[in-house]
Amino acid sequence: MKRTVVKARAFELVDDEGNVRARLGLANDDSPFLSLHDPDGRVRARFGLDASGAAGLAIGDEEGKVRATLGLATDGSSSLALGDKNGKIRAKFGLAAEGSPTLGLQHRDGETRFVFSIAQQGSPTLSLQDEDGKARARLGLAAEGSPVLRLLNKEGELRVLMGLADDGTPVLQFVKDNEPTWSASDAVEVPESEPAEGSEAAVGTEPQS
């Protein structure tokens, strides 16, 4: 049977009242999208690709506020974001391009205040951030399981470090200008326990549609 091909720039589905309920078309940059509308014409769901090819799904409520987004970037990173009734994103979950997961919780003003991530080698890190979005405290485990707590100032500089060395020796250091000014155990070295590169960025990536 011969196939029939219909070509157009856009398609619209309407209800019995003539209201558009679904639209398939191209955005101004020729990116394809599919949008679903409620009886009042508000977009409740939209799926599409941006100019780079990244895919995104956005779901809105009856007030037109986006409440959930799901996206996949061209570098392989993905993200899920959940918003409140004011359209402010309050929780984000994402995977960096190399697969490191990150969970971020945000204040109602939109600033990220809590980040939990797992590095590529499996080390977990908990980050607490201030109203400017800067990390002020980090608690994590190194690859071999040694715990590390870092306290940072408003500029993001390390000031206090507490942890256990590989052999279980407790360590406490006061730091200024990245140099220890006082240490309770200066003969041992605390293992690194920083978030994986790009892990926090992944959770902040908004799906494009």
Per-range role (PLM):
Residues 1-194:
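Parallel beta-helix/beta-solenoid repeats that form elongated, surface-exposed shafts/blades used
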Residues 196-209:
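Long, low-complexity, intrinsically disordered segments
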